[in-house]
Amino acid sequence: MKLLYFDCSMGAAGDMITASLLSLYPHPEEILPRLNAIGIPNVTYTLLRGENCGISGLMMRVLIGGKEEKTLDVLDHEALAGLSPTGPVPTGDAGHHEHHHEHTHHHEHREPGHHDHHHSHHNLSDIKAIVKDLHLTDSVKADVLAVYDALAEAESRAHQKPVSEIHFHEVGNLDAIADIAAACYLIHDLAPEKIMASPIHIGSGFVHCAHGILPVPAPATGYLLEGIPIYGGTIQGELCTPTGAAILKHFVQHFGPLPVMTTKAIGYGLGHKVYPVANVLRTLLGETGEKVRSLWHLTCQIDDMTGEEAAFAMELSLIHISEPTRHLRIS
């Protein structure tokens, strides 16, 4: 079975997820034109190679009108790391999460006064209109919208407002839309049969947002991570952003330790901040010996039926179940 595994020992962010997925391809630069053909208005995907604590990997940058937005947290912790372009892009910087550190809490980390002309916010209906016109298959579009539905629901709970009244800030920007669309496209293109992830390292301390300084995880991120194993640790800062949390929540089927698998490719997505440990998101693509099996459990209350009639009903049920998943239990 083809397995995709996310190692979230340094959290997860939208651009890091995209970069790590691109790293799984033998020639990531050849995939870049496909991302730029998605058709997000005024958006250009660019790719940089670099190192973090000696680990080589990729960094995804999204340019809006030829410019890249940076958030307050990134600006505060930024450090040059000798990146070299893999396409028509300038050399850049590395350090930690997300060029835009796209924190869902619709305030996300933008520095007051740092809002460029392309720093626009959208509500859910605006985003749906943008996604509708993208050059993606219907199934990929459905996943993009599902990720945003999760973000909207988390924001709604955090701010005690109906989803219809939620106006996204950072995660409503075009660069965040680009991260989500690219991640969904690449996961579909890689076509794993199962997706797993480690427990997510969320960081600790506080994070700068448009609404002020909030504890990690920020409220919306916390809601997105409900039901998912997480841990804090001693690293100060937000390691798991809302966009990263929403993407993983939507796609990951099981959170736990790395299972026995034969790896075919390993990818590293570099973050923007510098920490004492390698700030990377690692993905592993390979094969595991586990068999895919579905179990259909039908429960019914029989008042007056002969054994022959019950057997006939079971036979009819099996006809509509494909051979690889023909495991039926009736109680």
What are these regions (language model features)?
Residues 306-318, 322:
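Short amphipathic alpha-helix segments
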Residues 11, 60, 175, 248, ...:
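Divalent metal-coordination and catalytic microenvironments
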Residues 192-294:
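Mobile "lid/hinge" segments at catalytic clefts and subdomain interfaces of large enzymes
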Residues 6-18, 168-187:
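Conserved phosphate/anionic-ligand binding catalytic regions in large, soluble enzymes, centered on
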Residues 319-331:
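Single conserved hydrophobic/aromatic residue that forms the stacking wall/gate
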Residues 1-4:
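Extreme N-terminal starter segment of soluble prokaryotic enzymes
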Residues 292-304:
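Short glycine-/aliphatic-rich beta-strand segments at the starts of folded cytosolic domains
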Residues 23-24, 28-158, 218, 227-230, ...:
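Glycine-rich nucleotide/cofactor/substrate-binding loop typically near the N-terminus or early
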